[in-house]
């Protein structure tokens, strides 16, 4: 499956020929290299391993250095992904943004913005209690343990807690523009994560 590691630059808007304004997210790609292969005989399935963004030399361990010995002029990478069903590439080859030329829709995976510790209303969209005078609670969670049966709170019950900082995928984002010179891709709508965060862009599954 087609895929690249990119950086979310931010959002802007462009005008179509008919005058309609389209909100877009700009995703910029640093060079993505094939750094390895997985085979059916050795790993049980076939896939390509792609990497992007050089890792700081202080963070490169000896085992990681050994993995890159056979690759000339390619430094150890910070971000690594697996691409299944993508043929025609060998170790050391670069995957460029033009692979999305024939693609109309993409899935984008990123890490959502961290919001810190939040209450149930913000975190889970609960309605809360009555706002009127005399109510004992306004933004509280309410009961979590039912009555005599089961007389306990089940694991996984929605409560207040840390919000954000999770991996999230937005599917079927329309590809609006590809700029090969600037290694940029413009997709319609919003993408998970803050400006400058790294995302994985893949051809849409659906």
Curated annotation (Swiss-Prot):
Q: Which gene encodes it?
A: rplC
State the HAMAP family in the record. Answer: Ribosomal_uL3_B
RNA-binding keyword on record: yes
Query: What are the annotated GO cellular component locations?
Result: cytosolic large ribosomal subunit
- Family named by the database record: Belongs to the universal ribosomal protein uL3 family.
Q: Which SUPFAM superfamilies match?
A: Translation proteins
Q: Does the keyword Ribosomal protein apply?
A: yes
What is the protein's species of origin? Borreliella burgdorferi (strain ZS7)
User: Which NCBIfam families does UniProt cross-reference here?
Assistant: L3_bact (TIGR03625)
Q: Which named protein is this?
A: Large ribosomal subunit protein uL3
Q: Name one Pfam family in it.
A: Ribosomal_L3
Q: Which domain of life is it from?
A: Bacteria
Question: What does the UniProt keyword field contain?
Answer: Ribonucleoprotein, Ribosomal protein, RNA-binding, rRNA-binding
Any idea which GO molecular function terms this record carries? rRNA binding; structural constituent of ribosome
- Supply the source organism's classification: Bacteria, Pseudomonadati, Spirochaetota, Spirochaetia, Spirochaetales
Record text on subunit structure and interactions = Part of the 50S ribosomal subunit. Forms a cluster with proteins L14 and L19.
A GO BP term, please? translation
Q: What does this protein do?
A: One of the primary rRNA binding proteins, it binds directly near the 3'-end of the 23S rRNA, where it nucleates assembly of the 50S subunit.
Region (Disordered) residue spans: 127-151
